[in-house]
Design a protein with these regions (language model features):
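Acidic/histidine-enriched segments that form metal/cofactor-coordinating
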Residues: 17-26, 101, 105-214, 260, ...
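An aromatic/glycine/proline-enriched structural segment found at the starts
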Residues: 19-24, 29-31, 225-290, 393, ...
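Histidine-acidic residue clusters that define the catalytic metal-binding segment
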Residues: 20-44, 168, 185-224, 252, ...
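M16/MPP (pitrilysin/insulinase) zinc-metallopeptidase core fold and M16-derived inactive scaffolds
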Residues: 66-131, 174, 193-197, 310-325, ...
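A structural supersecondary motif
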Residues: 75, 283-287, 307-349
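M16/insulysin-pitrilysin zinc metalloprotease superfamily fold
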Residues: 95-101, 131-162, 309-310, 334-392, ...
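Short acidic/His-enriched helical or mixed secondary-structure segments at domain edges of catalytic enzymes
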Residues: 164-183, 260-279, 317-326, 371-426, ...
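Non-catalytic, conformational "gating/processing" segments within enzyme and secreted inhibitor domains
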Residues: 182, 208-244, 442-445
Length: 471
């Protein structure tokens, strides 16, 4: 019987049921909830003699092995004038071949083993990923180690990745949301830190020597954390990694001059005019907090209510649902580990709605700072965050990946459990007190990308001084 048919049959039965018995049922919204207990796989740890740290979970569900590797070096280590170096280096580790194997030979070998190997770089870190059958793990991890230790950086592959990167930057110019986000990033962060973004000029300036130097400096065992899970015992895991990485010598690491200096751009309203653009991108942004901040959990809940909680958030309800002004509206928060993170709000709207959408965005931010969130919003946010914690540990790969991040940035392995405990013990009053103390909308930089000729009768200047920027 299909669920639909079962529902049809049940309808007359429900209709004849006495309503008094239903009236006596407790309201699920007021029922006390049991404290959430999350059971996670056991993470075991060990360190090789060269300083390479390993987190391991034994998982015999499938005859496979999954490895994630993280290095504490990302785009924040890009030299001045060469933004994009970390990303290009990581890409070429996989696509550029090794000293022993050309790119084509490496591809053919991995395809023959049905192995997946990837590399990438983010703001604070670079990393790699491996997934393969257990029987092939010694060979695949040997190849992975070879890519890290002896990358080829052949001229033709460097040229290919450079052109690919330049093509991506050119395509971004046709994506208003990407153009606006890049502009806002420069308003929120100084050009020595997260505001140091790749440009065609910086990508063209990157040399083969730069790529080799970045890899040699940062991709070393004592700057590396590995997360390993799969059909292995602890002794097998140790032997496997010792064979692949054990003779890789440690290296001296330079100091990381990471910057969280405030931007020179004052809080206010910035306009990047683009003639002929029918739609506007409206953004608000400010520096945020680090992952270890004591108020992270409380403010995370408040920001979920403001703009991150799906279709039920305030920005979406006000700007899109109630006023019908935007195709999308909300906010996002990035918590960083070694530098300050970011908060930003957004609305994608038609030209004539630009000024009103921006005004409503600002009002909702001010309302949150002044009044906090309601009891109902707090309960919904808390439930959502607890559910996220449950599903964040759905697989061994998820759990060991979280452990890698905590270890890489010097946090205890029980950080996630402590955060969950703190969430369950938080009160609405504590959340709103943190909001009043830490969230200051007057520090927001609002950034509009659009055509002023299409804004209609409403003037952007009605919201305050407007500073034109080129993006």
């Amino acid at each position: 019987m299909t669920p639909f048919l079962a529902a049809l049959i049940a309808l007359p039965i429900l209709a004849q049921a006495p309503t008094g018995s239903l009236d006596r049922l407790p309201d699920p919204r007021t029922m006390p909830a049991a404290k959430l207990q999350v059971s996670l796989p056991k993470v075991q740890s060990f360190t090789l003699s060269n300083g390479l740290r390993v987190l391991f979970i034994e998982d015999h569900d499938l005859p496979a092995v999954t490895l994630s590797a993280a290095f504490k070096a990302g785009s924040l280590e890009d030299p001045s004038g060469k933004a994009g170096l970390a990303s290009m280096t990581a890409t070429l580790l996989r696509s550029g071949g090794t000293k022993r194997l050309t790119a084509s030979q490496l591809d053919e070998t991995l395809e023959g083993l049905a192995a997946d190997v990837e590399f990438g770089a983010d703001t604070e870190q670079s990393g790699g990923y491996v997934h393969c059958f257990k029987k092939d793990a010694p060979q695949v991890l040997g190849l992975f180690a070879e890519m890290l230790r002896e990358p080829r950086f052949a001229q033709d592959r460097v040229a290919f990745v450079r052109n690919q990167t330049l093509s991506g930057l050119k395509q971004m110019e046709d994506q208003p949301i990407q153009v606006a986000l890049r502009g806002l990033r420069r308003m929120v962060f100084n050009d020595k830190g997260q505001g140091h973004v790749a440009t065609p000029e910086s990508v063209k300036a990157i040399t083969e020597q730069d790529l080799r130097a970045f890899a040699k400096t940062w991709f070393v065992p004592n700057n590396m954390v590995i997360g390993l899970s799969g059909d292995l015992s602890l002794s097998e895991a140790k032997a496997l990694l010792k064979k692949a990485f054990g003779d890789w010598p440690k290296a001296s690491l330079p100091a990381q001059a990471r910057s969280s200096e405030p931007t020179k751009a004052e809080p206010g309203l910035y306009l990047q005019a683009k003639a002929g653009l029918n739609q506007s991108v409206v953004l608000g942004g400010m520096q945020g907090m680090r992952d270890t901040d004591p108020d992270r959990v409380a403010l995370g809940a408040a920001f979920l209510v403001l703009g991150e909680g799906g279709f039920g958030n305030r920005l979406f309800n006000t700007i899109r649902t109630q006023h019908g002004l935007a195709y999308a509206a909300g906010s996002a928060t990035a918590f960083r580990n070694t530098v300050d993170g970011a908060f930003f709000s957004y609305a994608l709207t038609k030209g004539e709605s630009t000024v009103k959408a921006l005004g409503l965005m600002r009002e909702e931010c001010q309302k949150l700072a002044a009044k906090g969130i309601t009891p109902e919003e707090w309960e919904n946010a808390k439930r959502t965050l607890l559910n996220q914690e449950v599903f964040a540990g759905a697989t061994s790969r998820d759990v060991v990946g979280t452990a890698v991040q905590h270890t890489l940035f010097g946090q205890p392995l029980d950080t996630r459990a402590k955060r969950l405990e703190k969430l369950q013990g938080l009160s609405l009053e504590q959340v709103n007190e943190a909001v009043r103390r830490r969230f200051h909308p007057e520090q927001l930089r609002f950034y509009v990308l659009g055509d002023p000729a299409g804004f209609g009768e409403a003037k952007l200047e009605s919201l305050g001084k407007v500073t034109p920027v080129k993006g």
